[in-house]
Swiss-Prot record:
Shared alpha chain of the active heterodimeric glycoprotein hormones thyrotropin/thyroid stimulating hormone/TSH, lutropin/luteinizing hormone/LH, follitropin/follicle stimulating hormone/FSH and choriogonadotropin/CG. These hormones bind specific receptors on target cells that in turn activate downstream signaling pathways. The gene is CGA. Pfam families: Hormone_6. This is Glycoprotein hormones alpha chain. It is found in: Secreted.
Length: 120
């Protein structure tokens, strides 16, 4: 009988520690965050009152899958995983000067397309 009480005590302590850790995080910490749609959003750093600068921001498609054997045979350096992705890029833009002599792109339309600059 005393043997079962020890196990019950250990289980209760473990459960209470787990619940304490779980409740110490803000709401939604463990849930998947929604990824915003790819669209122009205001860049607060370059924008001025009355002259907003927009940059494309948001999420697009990406996936990884095992490299097909037929493709693997043609690779100089074989890799087991192949990945595909698209990035949120400007479909149309205008170049503007801000802060005197800094040229930036003011994005007017965005879409998901080939990633040219990869962020690490």
């Amino acid at each position: 009988m005393d043997y079962y009480r020890k196990y019950a005590a250990v289980i209760l302590v473990t459960l209470s520690v787990f619940l304490h850790i779980l409740h110490s995080f803000p709401d939604g910490e463990f849930t998947m965050q929604d990824c915003p749609e790819c669209k122009p959003r205001e860049n607060k750093f370059f924008s001025k009152p009355g002259a907003p600068i927009y940059q494309c921001m948001g999420c697009c498609f990406s996936r990884a899958y095992p490299t097909p054997l037929r493709s693997k045979k043609t690779m100089l350096v074989q890799k087991n995983v192949t990945s595909e992705s698209t990035c949120c890029v400007a479909k149309s833009l205008t170049r503007v000067m801000v802060m005197g002599n800094v040229r930036v792109e003011n994005h007017t339309q965005c879409h998901c397309s080939t990633c040219y600059y990869h962020k690490f």
